[in-house]
């Protein structure tokens, strides 16, 4: 048995030193180690009203989640607002980590499915000031789990399992005030906290050799957001948002274990890394076409050229470009009386273009979004769907999202019973 162990040592050495080189040559495209699931261009949580109208949010005051991208809109919410949003996400991937990068091949795209609580928050108005609090799941680092087996003559010779999970949460506090009847300013501070966990387990059954590679990282950081809302006229309003570059700090630990019936070798390491996040600028507009129909347009700029990332003490090169995400949408409302109350039923329709920053694989997602809802002066229930198709990678990746949002406005007297 010792002879067999020595025989496989060169293979083990090749596995851990040559494989990273192969990965660097083939590349995972959009899904590098730290890439969020779905898109790099994330700027706060998506709720149903914004999602359904082409991801347009910068000039739309729909719920308390505005503190994540334009806190000035807090002044446009009812005096007391409680917001809850959840979503189901279905995202296709082709290449990531060891999958379709020269080590493990699949016949087609793999799918990651998640159901998550996107946002929970509240806003409260006191005089000319409005304060907002919120917690949100802003990024998901999960990947489809995969198990590989090499079988010959109904005998398993080799098997491998890979797994990656993780997420990033944002805990926000925001303050906004009206300078006059047309102009509002706001600012938010968001504390980000999350983790990323990756594991590889490979086993040669005949020789009873096992390799375990485990990595765990804690992510922390503070992000600031400043916002402006300005009503040019009774029909046209603008929203402006700014989030300056900032640093995420990452604490990581890893263990590499080699097991045989006669040998156990374990190597542990720790690292402190820094991730430089980019500048984000946003401009949004709202046009009231008539009493039933509103139009929205959002443009978001992400300065990915200056993005920097280190992984367990080593700087990783990211060949990124700056990106501009554009969304446009409509909201049409009908009104009716029921049970002594006035109700509104909004219908959403939108389009969005979401280019990814990687220069080697110029990938872009194109979205069709739609949704509906029901609301009165007390509550608002909305649900929307985004259907996305990717172009540029050669794999026609699909991304679907279903969002459900509930907003509760218990302060009826101050709200004057009006539905916006």
Which functions belong to the PLM regions below?
Residues 14, 90-97, 331-337, 410:
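Short regulatory "switch" loops immediately downstream of catalytic or recognition motifs
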Residues 1-7:
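Positively charged n-region of N-terminal signal peptides that target proteins for export
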Residues 25-51, 79, 116-420:
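Outer-membrane beta-barrel porins/channels
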Residues 9-21:
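Bacterial N-terminal signal peptides
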Residues 48, 61-69, 74-146:
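Outer-membrane beta-barrel translocator/receptor signature
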């Amino acid at each position: 048995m010792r002879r067999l162990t020595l025989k496989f040592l060169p293979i083990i050495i090749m596995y851990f030193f040559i494989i990273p080189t192969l990965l660097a040559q083939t590349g995972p495209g959009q899904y590098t180690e730290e890439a969020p699931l779905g898109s790099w261009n994330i700027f706060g949580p998506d709720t149903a009203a914004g999602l359904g109208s082409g991801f347009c949010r910068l000039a739309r005051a729909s719920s308390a989640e505005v503190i994540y991208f334009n806190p000035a809109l807090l002044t446009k919410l009812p005096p007391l607002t409680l917001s809850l949003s959840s979503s189901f996400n279905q995202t296709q991937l082709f290449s990531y980590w060891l999958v379709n990068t020269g080590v493990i091949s699949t016949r087609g795209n793999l799918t990651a499915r998640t159901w998550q609580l996107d946002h929970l928050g509240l806003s409260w108005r006191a005089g000319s000031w409005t304060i907002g609090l919120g917690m949100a799941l802003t990024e998901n680092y999960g990947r489809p789990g995969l198990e590989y087996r090499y079988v010959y003559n109904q005998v398993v010779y080799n098997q491998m399992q890979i797994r990656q999970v993780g997420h990033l949460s944002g805990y926000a506090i925001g303050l906004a005030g009206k300078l006059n009847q047309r102009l509002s300013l706001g600012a938010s501070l968001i504390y980000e906290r999350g983790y990323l966990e990756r594991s590889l387990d490979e086993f040669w059954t005949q020789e009873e050799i096992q390799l375990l590679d485990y990595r765990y990282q804690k992510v922390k950081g503070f992000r600031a957001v400043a916002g402006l809302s300005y009503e040019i006229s009774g029909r046209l309003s603008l929203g402006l948002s700014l989030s300056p570059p900032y640093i995420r700090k990452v604490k990581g630990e890893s263990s590499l274990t080699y097991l045989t019936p006669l040998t156990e070798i374990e190597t542990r390491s720790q690292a402190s890394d820094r991730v430089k996040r980019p500048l984000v600028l946003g401009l949004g507009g709202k046009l009231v076409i008539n009493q039933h129909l509103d139009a929205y347009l959002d443009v978001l700029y992400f300065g990915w050229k200056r993005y920097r990332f280190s992984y367990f003490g080593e700087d990783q090169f990211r060949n990124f470009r700056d990106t501009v995400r554009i969304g446009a949408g409509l909201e049409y409302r009908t009104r009716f009386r029921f049970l002594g109350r006035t109700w509104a039923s909004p219908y959403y329709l939108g389009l969005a273009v979401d280019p990814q920053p990687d220069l080697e694989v110029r990938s872009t997602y194109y979205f069709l979004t739609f949704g509906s809802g029901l609301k009165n002066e007390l509550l608002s229930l909305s649900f929307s769907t985004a259907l996305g198709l990717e172009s540029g990678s050669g794999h026609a990746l699909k991304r679907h999202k279903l969002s459900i949002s509930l907003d509760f406005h218990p302060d009826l007297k101050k709200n004057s019973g009006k539905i916006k």
